[in-house]
Swiss-Prot record:
Catalyzed reactions per annotation: adenosine(1618) in 23S rRNA + S-adenosyl-L-methionine = N(6)-methyladenosine(1618) in 23S rRNA + S-adenosyl-L-homocysteine + H(+)
UniProt function note: Specifically methylates the adenine in position 1618 of 23S rRNA.
NCBIfam families documented for this protein: PRK11727.1 (NF008725)
Pfam families for the chain: Methyltransf_10
Name of the protein in question: Ribosomal RNA large subunit methyltransferase F
Provenance organism: Shewanella sp. (strain MR-4)
EC number: 2.1.1.181
Source lineage: Bacteria, Pseudomonadati, Pseudomonadota, Gammaproteobacteria, Alteromonadales
Gene Ontology MF annotations: 23S rRNA (adenine(1618)-N(6))-methyltransferase activity
GO CC terms in record: cytoplasm
Family under the similarity heading: Belongs to the methyltransferase superfamily. METTL16/RlmF family.
Compartments, as annotated in UniProt: Cytoplasm
Record-linked HAMAP family: 23SrRNA_methyltr_F (MF_01848)
Amino acid sequence: MPKPAIKTAAKPATSSAGKRGKPITPKSVAKPQAAKPKTVSKPKVKPGEKKRLHPRNLHINGYDFPVLMVSYPKLKAFVRPTPYGDLSIDFADPSAVKTLNAALLQHHYGLAFWDIPKGALCPPIPGRVDYLHYLADLLFEGGKVKRAAAIRALDIGTGANGVYAILGHQVYDWQFVASDINPQSLTNVQRIIDNNPSLQGHLSLRRQQDDKAVFKGIIQASDRFELTLCNPPFHGSLKEASQGSLRKVRNLQLNRGEQPKATSATLNFGGQAAELWCQGGEKQFLATMIRESQAFAEQCLWFTSLVSKQENLKPCYQALEKLGVDTVKTIEMQQGNKITRLLAWSFHSQAKRLQWRNQIVSGT
């Protein structure tokens, strides 16, 4: 099936603050003179109205279950009516969520095959593709967003699902390097690639050997990336991750009007250890990422990451200010009741960013 068409959307509201003068290079660090980065102002939302997905998001109006069930018949077994007269699935059931994802990836994004092993993180497709749409806006800086096969992106911590790299290529034709510390995760992503001709030759995989590193050992001397992206491990320990999963299951049961009764045996928010938690949690992971980014400043146009906990933004801004980065932007995203932030930074001036991007897109 043809890949999704791209419509031009208005530039997302962001804020930026930057150092005037030459961008920092990995070999020399000037004293930061930039004003402290500012967070993006919260979008004005009418009372009772939720912030919607990105305007280009195919799922902005929810899931069309009747169409999906025709396109992907396996989904029928998991769809049931809600008390409000709509159709839905049990989002606490990993098999239901995985089947919905497979249906979405086939119907909307042209995948012939997608699967993950039991216990692996099963991400919601609308939220994942939202990140990519905002990255496209970031890269084109208010101009017309174009599909461009020359754009290279690095997905840090791709997991067993590989959805960022998969969606990034299917929607925007970007080329991806996807990294992970778990060899089993990479094996599964390779299986997905092998079963989808549209992905072959466009996604390459690299294993991170050092559990305390982010970019080191992954970015090679000859690499140049227009974008890096990451959804960091959220929790700081296995216990914390388990408690978080239990809360999610209970909240789903309450939303359905059920009596909370989840136990460890019914924690269906899948996720291997490296996908859900790391020592120090999201805060430490982001600190390492920011620190390491300086060494690869000339090889990457934009570094980006999701930030789930708002309180982790301040230490990120402080660390970026110390490095003297040229530009820092924060974009708020929301899917349902979940709010997250896209943090982006570049060591390059706007003029240099536009020159870099235009050379890549035009092929000169």
